[in-house]
């Protein structure tokens, strides 16, 4: 008996005009995630995944490239206006925001959501180089 062809529906890309950009800038890497208003991820990119390894991962240029890559994929969803949430003390904070602005997104708001302990865990010991 001949097999019947399996019918699959073509996945429809949802159109999202407003969204959020979450930038996690650590000392070692930068992660850029673009989401819709509910927080469902549309696209993401990292400095390490963009071809940078080792100490080059933690540069502002690597964060800029990661933001460009995430922005290019999010453009396909029709994303225009974004609200930026920045977390962490890393060197890629500023350059990732500038790259998203240069990619053609209208930034409506920038919020720093870096977690600050109210005298929580003991921090790591100081480095001796």
Curated annotation (Swiss-Prot):
Keywords: Ribonucleoprotein, Ribosomal protein, RNA-binding, rRNA-binding. One of its GO terms (biological process) is translation. It comes from the Bacteria. Pfam families: Ribosomal_S11. GO terms for molecular function: rRNA binding; structural constituent of ribosome. GO terms for cellular component: ribonucleoprotein complex; ribosome. PANTHER family: 40S RIBOSOMAL PROTEIN S14/30S RIBOSOMAL PROTEIN S11. Located on the platform of the 30S subunit, it bridges several disparate RNA helices of the 16S rRNA. Forms part of the Shine-Dalgarno cleft in the 70S ribosome. Belongs to the universal ribosomal protein uS11 family. Part of the 30S ribosomal subunit. Interacts with proteins S7 and S18. Binds to IF-3. This is Small ribosomal subunit protein uS11. It comes from Colwellia psychrerythraea (strain 34H / ATCC BAA-681).
């Amino acid at each position: 008996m001949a097999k019947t062809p399996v019918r699959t529906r073509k996945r429809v890309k949802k159109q999202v005009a407003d969204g959020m950009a979450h930038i996690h800038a650590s000392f070692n890497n930068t992660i850029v995630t673009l989401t819709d208003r509910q927080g469902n991820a549309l696209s993401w990119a990292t400095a390490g995944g963009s071809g940078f390894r080792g100490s080059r991962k933690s540069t502002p240029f690597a964060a800029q490239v990661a933001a460009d890559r995430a922005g290019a994929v999010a453009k396909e969803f029709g994303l225009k206006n974004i609200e930026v949430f920045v977390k962490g003390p890393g060197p890629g904070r500023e350059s990732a925001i500038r790259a998203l602005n240069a990619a053609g997104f209208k930034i409506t708001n920038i919020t720093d959501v870096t977690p600050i302990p109210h005298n929580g865990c003991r921090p790591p010991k100081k480095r001796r180089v």
